[in-house]
UniProtKB/Swiss-Prot annotation:
The gene is acyP. Residues 3-90 form the Acylphosphatase-like domain. Keywords: Hydrolase. GO terms for molecular function: acylphosphatase activity. The active site is at R18, N36. Its EC number is 3.6.1.7. It comes from the Bacteria. InterPro entries: Acylphosphatase, Acylphosphatase-like_dom, Acylphosphatase-like_dom_sf, Acylphosphatase_CS. Transmembrane segments: none annotated. Pfam families: Acylphosphatase. The lineage of its organism: Bacteria, Pseudomonadati, Pseudomonadota, Gammaproteobacteria, Pasteurellales. This is Acylphosphatase. It catalyses: an acyl phosphate + H2O = a carboxylate + phosphate + H(+). PROSITE patterns: ACYLPHOSPHATASE_2, ACYLPHOSPHATASE_3.
Length: 90
């Protein structure tokens, strides 16, 4: 299983990005969370298999039709939290 931290920049807040990300994570089987960051980006922590992560990464690069993704930063997630599902955090 891979554990990744993604930072998504662009026009990604107030456009339903978190809701659509929640839906897509559910379809793919990703666990973790999505939340808005104070500076206007969106943070996503994702846990899944190689195939699940590849599909989720591809989706995050495009985002929902209501958003404009300018950049996707990907890092290994160093946290110790165990995720049972995918959720929106505030």
């Amino acid at each position: 299983m891979q554990q990744k931290l993604f930072i998504v920049t662009g026009h990604v807040q107030s456009v339903g990005f978190r809701f659509f990300t929640l839906q897509e994570a559910g379809k793919i089987g990703i666990k973790g969370y999505v939340k808005n960051r104070p500076e206007g980006s969106v943070e996503v922590v994702a846990v899944g298999s190689d195939a699940q992560m590849a599909a989720f990464r591809n989706w995050l690069q495009k985002g929902p039709p209501t958003s404009v993704v300018c950049n996707l930063i990907e890092q290994s997630y160093q946290g110790s939290e165990q995720f049972e599902h995918f959720e929106i955090r505030r």
